[in-house]
């Protein structure tokens, strides 16, 4: 759960840094960019969730070599999708910005931010698979350490580039880009240290990256992909409605959205637990244990959701004031 909160902080950090610039259109541009990449990358989150569940199952059924095979498949799929996204960038990025419908000044700033962050696609998608592998092997402390490093680096670079060097919104984009590849390097090095021998064997077996071997991996993630697409379409529609009402409304909605993401990822910690623990039970064929665990996690998730709602009702005003670029945005 704590790990997922750390994941959310990169978007929160970007919104806080741009708030210090004191310009509502620029803050609105970062909001548009953040949601654009949420739509673009989050629909690929099946690389993480699918890898987590399959790695957990493989650990009980076969062993570490099978877990390495799952990781190789996840990385191959991630790189393939990233390559397609980069090839489609000249067409896809303008279309997505048009769909969000921002006014001219906001769009100009959003193009600067989005054009830089878009190139981090390979790192983001491969990181999904790498983090899923670590979660599936219950390496949560290591994941938490990586996420904290990632977020602190992003915030430090953002402050230095955007405010210290006066790069503005471009500095925020570059800080996120650098942080993503630094996270990839750190996560990759850790996994190679933990499972280098198994990974070498899995990479040497070309059958692991054949289309036939990848089909089951893709099939099991189909429903996750479709669910996330529907969610991202809804968020994009809300962003467009905010953009049509001007930069101040867009910036205000962006702050609320980051709090929503923070809460969602906190609750998503229960999903991570379910993926690992139920993956192990599925691997053992323990149907009764599987059902009991699902019920227990749902009740705990409901309790945390109620507590979060109460916290936002009590302190929501103070939180939004600290992020707002201008008093009008806070209001």
Regions found by a protein language model. Name each.
Residues 8-28, 97-104, 160-167, 225, ...:
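Helix-terminus/linker motif at the lipid-water interface of multi-pass membrane proteins
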Residues 84-115, 307-331:
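Short membrane-interface helical motifs at transmembrane helix boundaries
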Residues 1-4, 38, 78, 117, ...:
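Residue-level signature of transmembrane alpha-helical cores of multipass secondary-active transporters
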Residues 176, 188-231:
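Interhelical loop/hinge segments that connect adjacent transmembrane helices in multipass membrane
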Residues 29-87, 127-136, 142-143, 252-316:
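Small-residue-rich hydrophobic transmembrane alpha-helices
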Residues 1-16, 20-21, 35-50, 54, ...:
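N-terminal transmembrane alpha-helices
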Residues 45-48, 116-136, 143-151, 172-188, ...:
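Short runs within selected transmembrane alpha-helices of multi-pass transporters and secretion channels
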Residues 151-185, 189, 316-318, 331:
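Membrane-interface helix-loop junctions in multi-pass transport and translocation proteins
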């Amino acid at each position: 759960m704590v790990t997922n909160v750390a994941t959310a902080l990169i978007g929160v950090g970007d919104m806080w840094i741009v708030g210090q610039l004191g310009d509502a259109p620029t803050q609105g541009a970062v909001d548009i960019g953040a949601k654009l990449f949420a739509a673009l990358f989050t629909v690929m989150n099946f690389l993480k969730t699918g890898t987590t569940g399959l790695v957990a199952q493989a650990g009980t059924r076969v062993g570490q070599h099978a877990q390495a095979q799952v990781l190789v498949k996840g990385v191959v799929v991630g790189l393939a999708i990233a390559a397609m996204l980069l090839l489609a960038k000249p067409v896809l990025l303008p279309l997505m910005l048009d769909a969000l419908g921002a006014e001219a000044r906001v769009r100009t700033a959003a193009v600067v931010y989005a054009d830089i962050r878009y190139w981090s696609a390979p790192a983001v998608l491969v990181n999904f698979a790498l983090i899923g592998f670590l979660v599936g092997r219950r390496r949560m402390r290591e994941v938490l350490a990586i996420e904290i490093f990632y977020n602190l680096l992003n915030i430090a670079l953002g402050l230095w580039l955007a405010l210290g060097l006066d790069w503005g919104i471009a500095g925020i984009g570059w800080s996120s880009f650098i942080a993503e590849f630094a996270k990839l390097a750190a996560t990759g090095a850790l996994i190679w240290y933990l499972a280098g021998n198994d990974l070498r064997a899995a990479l040497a077996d070309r059958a692991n990256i054949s289309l036939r071997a990848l089909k089951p991996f893709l099939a099991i993630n189909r429903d996750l992909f479709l669910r996330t697409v529907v969610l991202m379409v809804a968020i994009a529609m809300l962003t467009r409605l905010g953009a049509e009402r001007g930069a101040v409304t867009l910036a205000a909605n962006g702050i609320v959205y980051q709090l929503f993401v923070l809460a969602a990822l906190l609750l998503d910690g229960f999903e991570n637990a379910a993926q690992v623990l139920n993956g192990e039970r599925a691997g053992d064929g323990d149907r009764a244990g599987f059902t009991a665990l699902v019920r227990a996690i749902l009740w705990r998730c409901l309790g945390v959701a109620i507590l979060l709602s109460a916290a936002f009702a009590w302190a929501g005003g103070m939180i939004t004031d600290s992020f707002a670029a201008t008093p009008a945005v806070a209001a």
